[in-house]
Amino acid sequence: MKLVFRWYGEKHDTVTLEQIRQIPGVEGVVGALFDIPVGEVWPFEEIMKLKETVEKAGLKLEVIESVNVHEDIKLGLPTRDRYIENYKKTIRNLAKAGVKVVCYNFMPVFDWMRTDLHKKLPDGSETMEYDHRLIEGVTPDELIKRVKEGSQGFVLPGWEWDRLEKLRETFELYKNVDEEKLFENLVYFLERVIPVCEECDVKLAIHPDDPPWSIFGLPRIITNKENIERMLKAVDSPYNGITFCMGSLGANPENNIPEMIRYFGKMGRIHFAHVRNLKFTGEKSFYETAHPSFCGSHDLFEVMKAFHDIGYEGYIRPDHGRLIWGEKARPGYGLYDRALGATYILGLWEAIDKMKKRYC
């Protein structure tokens, strides 16, 4: 297991590389170029600037999250081939810079969804919440306004405002795209990009849909064991893998997280993992909690044991944390609670490892 920590760069993050460097066990950061418009080529020189900044702090840059997929590719428009060519060029540039894994998603319009970015918990901390009843009662425009107000000026990944300016137009285009068509468009993309990944030795890791069900009538296709396996078999290459986000998949209690880790892990298709916990509050509703098992609805001991059982040697990061101790930061991405999560993950891993050596 290689423990990493997401970082949004000097321009966009309240957390510094010096602070990340002091978290025990963290080897590197998960980064991106947030100022490059979606669909454009990431310049090699800009990638190297980011890498040099990270390495100067004593950390590694081997995972990118995310190289976003242009909406025209998801929609299957005639213009998609140009954007796919740009994506391939970006992968080649990342490979030249030593990047090993690229995370991406294939969610239409919204990369992720929450209805409250600042839910107050009884202990005074703030967290993010999803209440499906609120989704059913608002328009997409109203929700975007609510999220923008709740972002407190931070740029939220997947919610870049320039991408959402043409919201109504984009929704109109998706009226002709159901789950089967979206899946076909994903396969079209992978069939052209994966050969470049094989050539460059860069693993492509799709992020599950967050949450793993349809919102506003938009199709969702990476939500459970069955459709993930279908995607992997459609383009059957070890370079076509997944970012196993237990929080996204775990929002559906029907997804058996430890079993899925073992299944896809034995296939060698988990290239990157996000670990966090959440608390169910109703059907299709939850809020995010601190990482320990007793704080949420998932048993993180069993989750980490599943990773250990498959001999996982890939990258793993603590996912969203609460805002605690008065910290002002991007929702879900403050320093303190994620640092606590990192040490909890590391502690579970050490305990599981030593238990096996002692009793097996």
From Swiss-Prot:
Family the entry assigns: Belongs to the mannonate dehydratase family.
Keywords associated with the record: Iron, Lyase, Manganese
Protein name, UniProt field: Mannonate dehydratase
Pathway: Carbohydrate metabolism; pentose and glucuronate interconversion
GO molecular function: ferrous iron binding; manganese ion binding; mannonate dehydratase activity
InterPro entries: Man_deHydtase, Xyl_isomerase-like_sf
SUPFAM superfamilies xref list: Xylose isomerase-like
Organism: Thermotoga maritima (strain ATCC 43589 / DSM 3109 / JCM 10099 / NBRC 100826 / MSB8)
Gene that produces this protein: uxuA
Superkingdom per UniProt: Bacteria
Catalytic activity field: D-mannonate = 2-dehydro-3-deoxy-D-gluconate + H2O
Residue pairs linked by disulfide bridges in the UniProt entry: none
Keyword Disulfide bond: no
GO-annotated biological processes: D-glucuronate catabolic process
Cofactors (names): Fe(2+); Mn(2+)
EC number: 4.2.1.8
Keyword flag Lyase: yes
Gene3D superfamilies linked: Divalent-metal-dependent TIM barrel enzymes
Job of this protein: Catalyzes the dehydration of D-mannonate.
